[in-house]
């Protein structure tokens, strides 16, 4: 049973494609439509054989090995004809055979020649022993013995080198055979791939597809980004160095200007004696001012103590005789209708300054206009603004809230007004310092 016949006996292969090439019994290839069948988990596909194909695989392997064995001699012949090392080795082997035959004629007992290093050394040792015995018998000098030993060592070394060359050639031959067998296997697998079931194509999204060009473009982009980052870092470093240099220059210029300003000061015309006299005058004035303030404070304390010791009649007579002196007494002016009021302040009024002597009751800005001619609804402060007042004046307005708690007439309010409320009781006694106990 041959391989093609075994392959042809296999059932037709089902595929998801529309049509597949199929070889018939005559060897013709034709396209046949494939019926797509539904996949069922655990069910054997229709294209899978019922029996195992181990026998066919073994038969195919046996045929393949036979072909490889037949191809080996041809390759060896070609290699031997083309490789000079093999030719030299063959010549050497023929020479060794002739020498071995000659040695067999002389030696009665047969001798086995091995190819390993230990056997070669044993042969050399036996040859040395035989040669030494012969030399002792024939009384050959030591120089001849050394010469023969050297020749034997050289011959053993040459044989070893030739064996190494043979092994290298065999390795090359094996590698060539393996490559050829791999190529044959690839061809065979390619043919098998044609006969194997075709798998369903899997869709890959466009953003997930990566080609060689895209990979190279991505690597190039990464390289450009790294170069750009290095360039930006170098620019930042240069900019930082430039800023540091500018700051250093500014500091140096500032130091130079300060030194120049100090040098520009002319202290040659100064007179220490005049400066000392001016300082003495300032110190004397300060001492005099502090003494006057201290005397004024003591005088004020003495006056307060004197006024406290006076009786009520004496105090009133003293105040009438010596009234309080007001430095910046303001004349009470007349305000216009709806004029704003400004308080001039209560501090520093004892200083004799022009600003404290001004008339603060004089109208300003819109207070110059006559607001009496305005309608009644507009005669309020800040009309049309969020801070406008509800009433023009409170003189004619009753703002009493009769709904409040303190406006109600109740027993609690009456008791409060009679006992605790100030200004509503019929008591006109002067309150004492101690709090009286009420029962």
From Swiss-Prot:
Its main location: nucleus. The modification Phosphoserine is found at residues 52-53, 94, 116, 118, 132-133, 361, 432. PANTHER family: MICROFIBRIL-ASSOCIATED PROTEIN (PTHR15327). GO terms for biological process: mRNA splicing, via spliceosome. It comes from Mus musculus (Mouse). This is Microfibrillar-associated protein 1A. It comes from the Eukaryota. Residues 1-200 are annotated as: Disordered. The modification Phosphothreonine is found at residue 267. The lineage of its organism: Eukaryota, Metazoa, Chordata, Craniata, Vertebrata. Residues 23-34, 61-70, 145-163 have a biased composition (Basic and acidic residues).
């Amino acid at each position: 049973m041959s391989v093609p016949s075994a392959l042809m006996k296999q059932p037709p292969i089902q595929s998801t494609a529309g049509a597949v090439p199929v070889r018939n019994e005559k060897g013709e290839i034709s396209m046949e439509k494939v019926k797509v069948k539904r996949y069922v988990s655990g069910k054997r596909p229709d294209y899978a054989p019922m029996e195992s194909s181990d026998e066919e695989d073994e038969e195919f392997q046996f045929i393949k090995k036979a072909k490889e064995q037949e191809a080996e001699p041809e390759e060896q012949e070609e290699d031997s004809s083309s490789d000079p090392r093999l030719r030299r080795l063959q010549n050497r082997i023929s020479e060794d055979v002739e020498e071995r035959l000659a040695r067999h004629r002389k030696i009665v007992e047969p001798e086995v020649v091995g190819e390993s290093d230990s056997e070669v050394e044993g042969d050399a040792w036996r040859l040395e022993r035989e040669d030494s015995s012969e030399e002792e018998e024939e009384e050959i000098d030591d120089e001849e013995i050394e010469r023969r030993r050297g020749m034997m060592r050289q011959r053993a070394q040459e044989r070893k080198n030739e064996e190494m060359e043979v092994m290298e050639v065999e390795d090359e031959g094996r590698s060539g055979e393996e490559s050829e067998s791999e190529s044959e296997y690839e061809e065979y697998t390619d043919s098998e791939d044609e006969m194997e079931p075709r798998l369903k194509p899997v869709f890959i999204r466009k953003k997930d597809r990566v080609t060689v060009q895209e990979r190279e473009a991505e690597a190039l982009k990464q390289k450009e980004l790294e170069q750009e980052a290095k360039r930006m870092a170098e620019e930042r470093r240069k900019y930082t160095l430039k800023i540091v240099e500018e700051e250093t220059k500014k500091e140096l210029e500032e130091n130079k200007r300060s030194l120049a300003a100090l040098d520009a000061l002319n202290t040659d015309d100064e007179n220490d004696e005049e400066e000392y006299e001016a300082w003495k005058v300032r110190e004397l004035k300060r001492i005099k001012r502090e003494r006057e303030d201290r005397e004024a404070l003591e005088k004020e304390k003495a006056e307060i103590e004197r006024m406290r010791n006076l009786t009520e009649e004496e105090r009133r007579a003293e105040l009438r005789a010596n009234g309080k002196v007001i430095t910046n007494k303001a004349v009470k002016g007349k305000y216009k209708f709806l004029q704003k009021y400004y308080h001039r302040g209560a501090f520093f009024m004892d200083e004799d300054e022009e600003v404290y002597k001004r008339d603060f009751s004089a109208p300003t800005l819109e207070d110059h206009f006559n607001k009496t001619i305005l309608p009644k609804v507009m005669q309020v402060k800040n009309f049309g603004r969020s801070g406008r007042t509800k009433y023009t004046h409170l003189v004619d307005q009753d703002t009493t809230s009769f709904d409040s708690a303190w406006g109600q007439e109740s027993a609690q309010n009456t008791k409060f007004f009679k006992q605790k409320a100030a200004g509503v009781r019929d008591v006109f006694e002067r309150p004492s310092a101690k709090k009286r106990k009420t029962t």
